[in-house]
Structures are given as structure tokens and as C-alpha cells.
Amino acid sequence: MKQTILVTGGTGFIGSHTTVELQEAGYNVVIADNLSNSKIEVLDGIEKITGIRPAFEKVNLEDKEATERVFQKYPNIEGIIHFAASKAVGESVEKPLMYYRNNVVSLINLLEMMPKYNVKGFIFSSSCTVYGQPKPENLPVTEDAPHQKATSPYGNTKEINEQIIYDYIHSGAPIKSIVLRYFNPIGAHPTAHIGELPNGVPNNLIPYVTQTAMGIRKQLTIFGNDYNTEDGTCIRDYIYVVDLAKAHVAAMARVLDKETDKIEYFNIGTGSGNSTLEIVTTFEKATGVKVNWKFGPRREGDIEKIWGDCTKANTVLGWKADTPLEDVLASAWKWQQKLREDGVM
């Protein structure tokens, strides 16, 4: 019998790609999402790719009773992958209580349901933000690198939630967890049926690049060209969202295995960094489309450079991000063209 996995935030960017990979790996998927940052039409895209429409429940996970109804309706859930969260750094500074309520309360509600409904495995969507700006000698960062004080309430919710999961498991809760610390997910499914759907002006680099290339935005501003990097722009570890989704399938198989540790942590990235300027020039090379860009002043709170040591995920999960950057950026452009064709943007 197929194992059933609850994917919270499953109509979002990473959640939708992970749902596809889970279905293709033979799992049943139930999506719980309040659609605050995504669209119900994403389910159509998932179905076009896999031939299966996942079960869907519109629910606010900060509402404990509504959350419990999902578990009552689907009593065979064996594992949870928890993506659902508010995620805009700037907005979190303006509305910290909303972020703490949404991101922390929803986690607590899910964890409380697990023993009651015999759910064994929990994959948490964390972030490399917990590392802050690593010292140069600590690059690439490993899972045991020191954590820095978060620079935003959003980043702080990731740190707090990691601690809540740790404390709950160490209190003797009959569950297991894998915490995945992502770097920067980019790109879109090769079919262009699903991808990143920013609301309004994008917060992330790649949608801004593709929208500028399409003429939706007049100009891309690269924030800061005086950093201590080769070309003066920030460096990040950009990981293809499909590769990232496959890491969740590997993590779920592991967390449902009775023989593994109660809690484990994995960096999920490529293991190398690319500068902002490199991303723009590689996009132009991959697509043959010019991007109108300029340098601007540094943006407050931006980390200079970070990339992950992903050896542990490579060896323990048997997973590796190996899609070439040009292919990833071409997939993002194909998705942007599809959005234009469909009249979305």
C-alpha cells in the first residue's frame, strides 16, 4: 500500500515541485495550504506532470481545530513535510507578530498532532539563514557550523522552530525528524507546468531577472558591487528546485526508516557559490536574452557570501544537486515565457 505524506504549503514553489517528486516516487500526497502565497491552479500543473491530482485541503495551520480535521480526514498519514510559512524577510521586519504566529504556532500544532495520529516522520524546511554570515574560514558551511543571531524575524522563526523540534524529540516524543537547511532554490520544472509565482514585485533574484528580460520590470538593480568577492557582488549557493525536491524524497525515505537517528540535519545546496553578476551573465548566455541591469547601493541585511558543504547529504541521503546552472536558468526563462503565453504576467 502506498504511504501517505502530508505536504504543508504544497501549492507553493518548493512544495509543488516536491509533491511532483513524491508522487513520481510512489507516495500518496495530501496538500494542506491556505493559498495566501500561492494559487489553486498549481494543482492543475502537478496533475499535468504526474497524471495524479493530489488531495487538497485549504487550511490555516495556526488554527489547531482546522489542522486536526486534516488528520481526522486522512488517518493514514505517515510523514509530514512542512513548507507552509510566511517567507518575506522585509515583511517580517514590519509584521513580526504575524510571522511568529504563522510560522511558529503552525509548527507546534503539527507536532502535537503527530503522536495522536501515529505520524512518525517530520521533514522541516529550514534555511541557511541560521548560519548568518559565516567567517571566511568556515566556508563552505557544514551542518555543525555555529549559528548566528538572525537578522530578521523570518530568519529567527527558522532558528526557533529548529529548537522546538529538537526539544520536543528530546522530551521523548515518539517521532523522528530531518531538518533540511536550504540554500537558494531557483528554476522551474522542465515541463514549465509549475514554477515560482511571486506576488507583485519579486523578492528573489531569478524572477526579477526573468521579469526584466521579459520587459515586465524596467531594470534589475544588483545591490552592491563593493563586497569582498571576485566581482564585488554577493555570492550564494543556487540550487535547482527539482534537485531540492528530490532531496525531500530521499529524506522522507530515511526518516520513515526505523533504524536512523531521532533527529538529523542536512545542508541542501550545490556545494559551490555563484555571484549575483554571474547569475545575470549566465542567464544571458543560456537564453540569448539581454537583461537591463545596473549596480545600486548595498541592501541592508544582505550576507556577503555563503555556500554549503553538502557532503553529508551526498553520502548519507545518496543525493546530489547536479543540474548545470545554465540549464536551471533556461528552465526559469521557459517558465516565464509560459506565464506570458497563459496571460498570467
Model-found features: residue ranges?
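C-terminal substrate-binding subdomain of Rossmann-fold SDR/epimerase-dehydratase oxidoreductases
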Residues: V59, I206-M345
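N-terminal Rossmann/SDR dinucleotide-binding element
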Residues: K2-G79, V201
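Catalytic helix-loop patch of NAD(P)-dependent Rossmann-fold dehydrogenases
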Residues: E94-L97, R101, V105-E112, K116, ...
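Rossmann-fold NAD(P)-dependent oxidoreductase module
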Residues: H17, E21, M113, I164, ...
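Residues at the starts of beta-strands that form the adenosine-phosphate
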Residues: N28, K120-G121, K176
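N-terminal Rossmann-like NAD(P) cofactor-binding module of classical short-chain dehydrogenase/reductase
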Residues: E78-I81, I123
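Conserved NAD(P)H cofactor-binding loop of Rossmann-fold oxidoreductase domains
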Residues: A84-K87, S126-S127
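Conserved mid-core alpha-helix of short-chain dehydrogenase/reductase
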Residues: A66, N109-M113, D243-K246
